[in-house]
Amino acid sequence: MNNTKSPKNVSLKNQLELWLFCALIGAVAGALVWILLKIMAVGTEFLWKWLPGKTSVPYYTILICVAGAAIIGIFRKIFGDYPEDLETVMEKVRAEKRYEYKNMLVMMVAALLPLLIGSSVGPEAGLTGIIVGLCYWAGDNLKFAKQNTRNYSQIGAAVSMSVLFHAPLFGIFEVEENSEEDLAALTKGSKLFIYGIALAAGTGIYAGLSALFGAGLSGFPSFDMVEIQRKDYLLMILYILCGLILAYFYQATHKLTGNISNRFPAVVREIFAGLCLGIAGSFLPALMFSGEEQMGTLMKTYTSYLPLALIGIAFFKLLLTNLCIQFGLKGGHFFPVIFAGVCMGYGMAMLTCGPDGGHVVFGAAIVTASLLGGIMKKPLAVTMLLFLCFPVKMFIWIFIAAAVGSKLITLKPEQEPSADYSRQ
């Protein structure tokens, strides 16, 4: 009796295994995003709402930020420079053909600590490292997963970003939009289909856990549909220019704070960042945290701010974000950058057109798109990220602003060397 399997059956079996494993990766990514955001929500509720309501400690914000920063500094001195951002993780995958997965619990704790003390960073850093690490663990321990480990890691990172930002196509373009060759490879074959399977599983698990146990972060609020007037189109150049100025400021301060941080010994640099964060948060609480919830508040109360005050907040938010990232209170930059772009857009639109809702929404969209385009150099990813925040009719204008930003800002911050904690 001939037990030899036909090539067709073997190919079908391999394809099914690929689809099932990608669905599993997506489900794990969705669950991890939910766990991180839930712990973050419970922790911040306790530290910043429940505990202050039960005590009357003077300078509470400064105390929590400094004490938390000291803990983070000691943690990083013991375990290393975590969390790593998406670009660092994927660069290691490209250069080393693998990613170390032995420190996944450390990555999770390192990602959570800055978020709990109100650091001006987003939650995406750390998540991608954990997901990619799990994929390489599977490649080392599961025979059928070994040959596709890099693809699995890219899909896992993309799904985690998409679920986190509630933007289905953002993750895949953020991971893949590095060159025209990458985009061409993405549109050929079955990679988009496989990503769709993983995304469906991740979104389903995240939605299910949120329905059963409550969600953590709710994602950026969506702006209402507005009428775009001729004046708005004429002001596009001004809004794009403002976004470019912010992008240049972000990149310049990223490099500057990185150079300054290297002069501080371990733990001291984190404490310094915590002190700056606490002082800034005491005077202007909107500067703390990622900016996701703060933007919802801003959408309702922006008319109570002077336009120049909103513009100032945009610059201070970017400066504080870079200070936190480079001085050890690390996290992602997407949420704070979007918040800064919206503040600048609101401020400029109010200066030129008054506080009318339609004008300020359009201004916020164009400034934010130009700003993100200048930082990320990925106009498609920027468009997909902002697609669910702003009205659909702005889609093409957002893409144009992001494309202009990605081409005109050339100051690229160099990768700052990680602090060597073992010698300090």
Spans of features found by a protein language model:
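Alpha-helical transmembrane segments and immediately membrane-proximal extracytoplasmic
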Residues: M1-Q424
